[in-house]
Amino acid sequence: MISLLKAREKLLSPLVSSTIRRLSSSLSYSREDSRDSEVLIHPSAVVHPNAVIGKGVSVGPYCTIGSSVKLGNGCKLYPSSHVFGNTELGESCVLMTGAVVGDELPGYTFIGCNNIIGHHAVVGVKCQDLKYKHGDECFLCIGNNNEIREFCSIHRSSKPSDKTVIGDNNLIMGSCHIAHDCKIGDRNIFANNTLLAGHVVVEDNTHTAGASVVHQFCHIGSFAFIGGGSVVSQDVPKYMMVAGERAELRGLNLEGLRRNGFTMSEMKSLRAAYRKIFMSTETVSLSFEERLTELEQDQELYSVPAVSAMLQSIRDSFTESRRGICKFRQWLDSTT
């Protein structure tokens, strides 16, 4: 009998050990899940009881969270950051010290997931347009994975029928300003002190150097580059580079195109098209419209998607309500 009991104990021992390990592991995961979902609010923070706080949110000292605020799972508010008004932050957003998001205004501020709002940045507040009517709804929508650095200011729209919109994966460096009703695409880099006036449209993959200024209603095409200290008062077509106190076209943004995966063949075609439009060597001088038409009739070049996109970007700039394109340096004494 004793030998039988010993044999049974020997047989069951691995099963018991395995069960204990599974239970221990389960309890460990349970404790980790509990820690991950725990909401940490510093005693000095002011959080309205009607605010919706997700799992794992951390609210630091002296923060303020208003009554209509929604914070997604995993958001972190560093000391003295504040969220006001009808404002929603997606998962894993970070507000650095002194950041202010939202305003007690009709409308809303919506910010997606994984965004960083830098020290003392002000995002989603009333615009500085005097045409804004008190009591009107105004809106700001920001996508995912944006880094908005210290002292930036981003304003809501100036009217209920419009929105200020920022896409995904943008880097907005320190002290930049994005005014009311701007439309910003994806993967743009705005260097320090870039200033965008109201209603500016910036497409995708653009790069502005420091202290660039863009006039209201201008349109910046994809893969464009704006040189440091430039004042842009007209549109910048796709793929082009501008610079100057009154920004002028300085050629194609070839380095930016190369970094973004454009082939040598595509860049060669773009250079040929650019020369036809802006650096024509024809003995008989053609008007700007005639040069565009001539390029459209060049089947070899126009069949390249990048070339046709560049040409369409130029043509769009001359439609009603648009400002035309920045002048080419050799145009300064010309009516074209």
UniProtKB/Swiss-Prot annotation:
GO terms for biological process: lipid A biosynthetic process; lipid X metabolic process. It is an enzyme of class 2 (transferase). Keywords: Acyltransferase, Lipid A biosynthesis, Lipid biosynthesis, Lipid metabolism, Mitochondrion, Transferase, Transit peptide. The keyword Glycosyltransferase does not apply. Residues 1-32 form a transit peptide. It catalyses: a (3R)-hydroxyacyl-[ACP] + UDP-N-acetyl-alpha-D-glucosamine = a UDP-3-O-[(3R)-3-hydroxyacyl]-N-acetyl-alpha-D-glucosamine + holo-[ACP]. It is found in: Mitochondrion. It comes from the Eukaryota. One of its GO terms (cellular component) is membrane. One of its GO terms (molecular function) is acyl-[acyl-carrier-protein]-UDP-N-acetylglucosamine O-acyltransferase activity. Involved in the biosynthesis of lipid A, a phosphorylated glycolipid that in bacteria anchors the lipopolysaccharide to the outer membrane of the cell. Lipid A-like molecules in plants may serve as structural components of the outer membranes of mitochondria and/or chloroplasts, or may be involved in signal transduction or plant defense responses (Potential). Homotrimer. Belongs to the transferase hexapeptide repeat family. LpxA subfamily. PANTHER family: ACYL-[ACYL-CARRIER-PROTEIN]--UDP-N-ACETYLGLUCOSAMINE O-ACYLTRANSFERASE, ACYL-[ACYL-CARRIER-PROTEIN]--UDP-N-ACETYLGLUCOSAMINE O-ACYLTRANSFERASE, MITOCHONDRIAL-RELATED. This is Probable acyl-[acyl-carrier-protein]--UDP-N-acetylglucosamine O-acyltransferase, mitochondrial. The lineage of its organism: Eukaryota, Viridiplantae, Streptophyta, Embryophyta, Tracheophyta. The gene is LPXA.
